Amino acid sequence: MADTAAARLNMVESQVRPADVTDVRLHDAMRDLAREQFVPPTKAYLAYADIEVEYAPGRALLKPRDVAKLLQAVRPMPGEQALAIVAPYAAAMLEHLGLTVTRLEEGDLSQPSPGSYDVIVCEGAVGRVPAGWLEVLARGGRLGVIERDGPVGKACVYVRAEDGIGRREAFDATPPVMAGFAAEHGFAFE
């Protein structure tokens, strides 16, 4: 699309705002960031569509609606430390919002380097959240991820409190499950 600024505005107005994303900071970030820079040039025309866009084998950007809802659910604040796991667009949005972002795109994605993060997000679905992600979540920290073990996944927010970790479901989503992160099914009598 020749006029990407208009495409970004249309994306926010037709996909993000109608999906109850009310955080104006997220609207502004999505209007400012060129989403087509996060996908191969051959897929740039899909960057603002209401679909997941594959940017590398087995890796896809979430739908604009879903990434905005996920980020709104984790309530990022300027100055916080964030970890973006296979989430290049979300990482750029978090940086735009004033967070310090560590990106994890390669290696053992289930075991981030030791640290303490206020916000953790992943743009790929997982069958189950790896324990390593929860271990690096700071007290009061929020992890936003889509858990999927079937046709429809649930965007979940995990919050670390003093006495443990809580979980709540935020919305339904259907991104592909990342390679190596499918739910393990055991034997069961039917």
Segments from the language model and where they lie:
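Conserved nucleotide-cofactor-binding alpha/beta core module
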Residues: 71, 75-165, 169
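Class I SAM-dependent transferase core
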Residues: 1-105, 163-183, 188-189
